[in-house]
Amino acid sequence: MLPLLAALLAAACPLPPARGGAVDAPGLLGAPLNASVNASSSDEPAAPRLLASAAPGAPERPEEEAAAPCNISVQRQMLSSLLVRWGRPRGFQCDLLLFSTNAHGRAFFAAAFHRVGPPLLIEHLGLAAGGAQQDLRLCVGCGWVRGRRPGRLRPTGATAGAPTALPAYPAAEPPGPLWLQGEPLHFCCLDFSLEELQGEPGWRLNRKPIESTLVACFMTLVIVVWSVAALIWPVPIIAGFLPNGMEQRRTTASAAAAAPAAVPAGTTAAAAAAAAAAAAAAAVTSGTATK
């Protein structure tokens, strides 16, 4: 009885096929694995899968700025120093190269300055021996990025609440050479000769340091003082060797002062009488005072 009932039930209610069951009845087995991805792709834009495509490219500078005219001026300050100026529109951080070009492929003098700004004073400039003509080339390269730190860029599209079902970003590749990590610089070069700079307003061929000037002034003062002293000190010595005229005048003056005053010849008797009267009066006065 039971086998017959089972056969009747099997004939009346056939079982669903083994293949394609998930397609015919999606509610029984649940959504497929890629359902969330497909749904997000239909409603929202696809999430970035590569770091390069997600990161926004750096805005490229127009060609006018890259091909800007060289606004570089060189001024000679002293015999072995140069003052270099260039325009600020070329960038914030600049690298400067200076080297000689008339040595048949070998630089007689070369100097490099990293991250400098105008104006720049270059001292201890190497000069060619024998006063030969020296041609130099000055190159300035500037960038527009200040203090960029090396590291992996973060995509702007990724947020803190991003779903975990998104594919992970690939690991950052090891950094390449140093000259490939930074921003490309556009160098602007200027060729000049040292002999051409002698007519500049700041050129001082015979300019000396302050120490030499002070020493020269001191030695000049010493020479003047010694010259005046050499003219003055022999005067009293020479006067000591010529005492005849001065002593004769001194002797005559002392004799005239010591001699008594001369009395005229006609007044001798009167003067004697006056002197006797004065002596008598003095004697009387002294006697009266004694009593």
Swiss-Prot record:
Gene Ontology MF annotations: peptide binding
PANTHER family linked to this entry: TRANSMEMBRANE PROTEIN 158
Glycan attachment residues as annotated in the record: 71
GO cellular component, one term: membrane
Keyword annotations of the record: Glycoprotein, Membrane, Signal, Transmembrane, Transmembrane helix
Transmembrane segments: 221-241, 261-281
Protein name: Transmembrane protein 158
Subcellular location: Membrane
Free-text function comment from the UniProt entry: Receptor for brain injury-derived neurotrophic peptide (BINP), a synthetic 13-mer peptide.
